[in-house]
Amino acid sequence: MDALLVEKVLLGLFVAAVLALVVAKLTGKRLRLPPGPAGAPIVGNWLQVGDDLNHRNLMALARRFGDILLLRMGVRNLVVVSSPDLAKEVLHTQGVEFGSRTRNVVFDIFTGKGQDMVFTVYGDHWRKMRRIMTVPFFTNKVVAQNRAGWEEEARLVVEDVRRDPAAATSGVVIRRRLQLMMYNDMFRIMFDRRFDSVDDPLFNKLKAFNAERSRLSQSFEYNYGDFIPVLRPFLRRYLARCHQLKSQRMKLFEDHFVQERKRVMEQTGEIRCAMDHILEAERKGEINHDNVLYIVENINVAAIETTLWSIEWGIAELVNHPSIQSKVREEMASVLGGAAVTEPDLERLPYLQAVVKETLRLRMAIPLLVPHMNLADGKLAGYDIPAESKILVNAWFLANDPKRWVRPDEFRPERFLEEEKAVEAHGNDFRFVPFGVGRRSCPGIILALPIIGITLGRLVQSFDLLPPPGMDKVDTTEKPGQFSNQILKHATVVCKPIDA
């Protein structure tokens, strides 16, 4: 960066500081703000807490400042909520008031400034997009129509692992094959198509683009330019890469998937998949073509990878807890005999369901949920919440607080058959809201729960899942991001066939 730009940035910071002090004096409005660490002018708490606002760091701050706290991150107000009662207030009781989504410089690029559903503000556009996406993606009818496909994809995973000679000896990184399964599960619903193998060039191009999109948006690297707009020139290359990637992904979605469905619909006149429903909504003038592409963007980001993370965490915990793995296997043998688990079987397998819930509790894929925002000044727990504050619900801490759970740091599925028997993943208890609650909850829960259950069930039926030779456990170190909680190292797992 040249000296002139640095000089301009420093001058901008000085002017901003003076203006902030003048405005504060002139307005004179005293707000009762939530507690939090004292901040410095302009940067606020940014230099104190840093960029890494992950669920564990925010838990530590909550233990210090309480169930609601305020961080001033440059020009952004960030409110962190860490109690079930306040989570209910944000997600349900004041679901309209706090029902919008925050914007940042990177997500504005990838969502066209909120032309999608997941990251748009609460209002008419969100209601329209939610309605258009619900019927083809998120209903019991969709589950009934697609469950056989999910079961088939899980069967093919088992077959491919069996064929790999390394799987039963040194082990394999099973995530790679499961990633193909997840893409096929969702692309069957979305486009009525699938990829034949992990070597498919189009699959690998799509996967690479989505991985880069995830890296760029999940990184904490760009926070400084979002918190302090005058520093945004330092992000020029970062944002240029985001724009370039967005164009590449949208072109790939359009050329290889959306246009194909248009051609098929013109030839047959039939509606066979979710994209056909969405293109019909475009034909009727309910949405524009950019909205169509942003729906594809949302499914690629919000449905595929998040479910894959949960499956990967579930496998790691089963490997590290062989007695729990055996109980799952014994339950399926008792209930199903030798039959492979199917989606309708899941309700007859309470221990398997408990394993899924315990995975979502301890290893929540979206530990802070998707951030909320209030468009107007609001109130929460008696405190003033300035308009356009970013509201983070630390859902992971709610589900792992030792004041509210028995031995929460243990992977113990039995809790959901004993003291927490009434607790479900759909949010009937605000201590456990892995998919959120209310208007902005994740509608993908209706797909994620059966896919996770089928996949873990089929793997445990078919294999004894073990750590690699010479190891007692697989590494479960976390890799937190802006919105995610992934496993740091994709585990190598020995898959020893049960019938061997």
Swiss-Prot record:
(E)-cinnamate binds at R213, S214, R215, L216, S217, Q218, A302. The keyword Transmembrane helix applies. It comes from the Eukaryota. Heme binds at C442. The chain crosses the membrane at residues 3-23. Belongs to the cytochrome P450 family. Its cofactor is heme. Pfam families: p450. It is a single-pass membrane protein. Keywords: Heme, Iron, Membrane, Metal-binding, Monooxygenase, Oxidoreductase, Transmembrane, Transmembrane helix. Its main location: membrane. It catalyses: (E)-cinnamate + reduced [NADPH--hemoprotein reductase] + O2 = (E)-4-coumarate + oxidized [NADPH--hemoprotein reductase] + H2O + H(+). Induction: Induced by wounding. Expressed in roots and leaves. One of its GO terms (biological process) is lignin metabolic process. This is Trans-cinnamate 4-monooxygenase. The keyword Transmembrane helix applies. PROSITE patterns: CYTOCHROME_P450.
